[in-house]
From Swiss-Prot:
Comp. bias intervals (Basic and acidic residues): 43-59, 316-325, 363-382, 390-400, 425-439
InterPro entries xrefs: OGF_rcpt, OGFr
Any single Pfam family the record assigns to this protein: OGFr_N
Coiled-coil residue windows: none
Gene Ontology CC entries for this record: membrane
Family assignment from sequence similarity: Belongs to the opioid growth factor receptor family.
GO molecular function, one term: opioid growth factor receptor activity
Protein name in UniProt: Opioid growth factor receptor-like protein 1
Span list, region Disordered: 1-91, 309-464
Bias (Low complexity) ranges: 74-86
Biased composition (Polar residues): 327-342, 452-464
Amino acid sequence: MGNLLGGVSFREPTTVEDCDSTWQTDSEPEPEQPGPAGGGEGQQHDEPEQPKQPPERAGGRPRASPVPEDHAEAAGAEQGGESTEGNAKPKRSFYAARDLYKYRHQYPNFKDIRYQNDLSNLRFYKNKIPFKPDGVYIEEVLNKWKGDYEKLEHNHTYIQWLFPLREQGLNFYAKELTTYEIEEFKKTKEAIRRFLLAYKMMLEFFGIKLIDKTGNVARAGNWQERFQHLNESQHNYLRITRILKSLGELGYESFKSPLVKFILHEALVENTIPNIKQSALEYFVYTIRDRRERRKLLRFAQKHYTPSENFIWGPPKKELPERSKAQKTPTLPASGSNGQTSTHKKSKDSKISPGASHVNSKSVEEKKGASREPGEEADKPSPEPGSGDPKPRNTEKDSAADQSDSPPEKTVPDTAGKGECPTSSEKDGEGEDQSKDSENPENAGCHAEVVAQQNATNPQTSSG
């Protein structure tokens, strides 16, 4: 199988998005998807559309890039600075995303180059060989190193043996796991028992204890002292990443989520280990193979992350451009119609249609008198001598005479400007249209007719 894979070239992921399918089928809500909840069996369902990695080197052995490991410590240091300043926005690490992409996909193009009868990791856990270069057996580590926090802190060669992976670590004496060795390890009760004891020992070193067989964890009795140490020793974040990976390789995928959830709670809610939150979100969460579990953890983290605008691990906002477009579309016509409406109102306030004056000249006149600004009559003189002092009683007579003497065809309202002749009082409120009346011959004839009627019915008005 390894030889077949070795001859196939796959497209290498080039961005964080290529490596991360957490929100691939879910942008906001949490759908219930059928499939396994974790473990290596669920890995094919996890990220089926993601590109795969080409061979790391000629022999086909997956190479553990030192960049992600260095970046893990750097990320922890940056997170420590952020916890004090609170202003720096974190960034997704492509190196971390690619490293964990390979892990979740069980190392594309992985090719075992060790003989199946080597089984160095299994033999170490069966207490048959010591780990190198120290020469210490697993039973001694579990019995004598337990609780010796100075030794566990400063020795950097045992962790690769206690939690083996299918990638090379910093201890080149440690051997990578093989697929055959993984299957044999899972079937060996002695090895599994010691592996769980090693896990408990390291949890206690971090101030955590395993409370049941399902992987649930809680604070240990020494949690305050150990959390303070964990918050200040970022290189232990890399150890936690290795432990989580190894749990998944050796059949304990279900133990990951409880531990990661506990760490996120302590970092984001209790604020006991705030410096770890960057590594927890960038590394620990993404060791989990099931997308649904990752989404649950990230939603929990997003709920408690501060400042909330700096949370960069949430679902992509794919609908955002459509929303902004939908908001802009009704805004433009609304503003345009408002502008037209206001212009229309101004024209109606300044001009009275002939049809409206024919129906109710008095009511229109009162409205015009109310809307007329102070000083309007002084600024806009009337062309008629007697129009500057209108009398309501004469105006009513003029309107009545106008209604009785007007030809039938002029009683029809005409919006085109060919309607009734406005009365002299209405002309007082039509300062801006008086010039138009003088230019219109029909309006000029109407003026003459109105003046003649006024002289005949009320001589005082023409002489005043």
